[in-house]
Amino acid sequence: MTQPEVSPIHQLFDSRNAEYRHPFGAVEEGCTVLFRILLPRWLGCRGAYLIRCPDGGDEALDGMFWAGQMDDSYEWWDCRYTPEKAGLVWYGFQLETGQGRRYLVRQPDATAALSASPGPLWQLTCYEQGFRTPDWLAGGVMY
């Protein structure tokens, strides 16, 4: 059976769009981040999970909640995650669907593609509470 295409008008996830991830950019430890994904209803999603992989740590799954329909064809799922310590957290999404386990994997433009296997993850940078950029670096670019 051929599966319908995902509409190019509807992004499944976009890490650079506050509708899908808020706040945008690096966050302070203890700051809660909202993650939202938009799934086509034909997928028959029964469960969605945020996959978290702290740098050097073990993978964890956080259950996402069904958050309503966008229209007759798409539905929102969301969850909140609060990083407890500074560092990098790699993340992605795992789906339990009518067609089996599926994943949302990162594309070069930071949006998501539906995949039958795990793939590239997104990165969340978490900095120490109270960290302040030195005045001499403000507005600069560091390589």
Regions found by a protein language model. Name each.
Residues M1-L34, P54-Y143:
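The feature marks proteins involved in alpha-glucan
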Residues V33-W42:
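Short edge beta-strand/loop segments characteristic of extracellular beta-sandwich folds
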Residues L43-L50:
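Solvent-exposed loop/turn segments flanking beta-strands in beta-repeat/beta-sandwich domains
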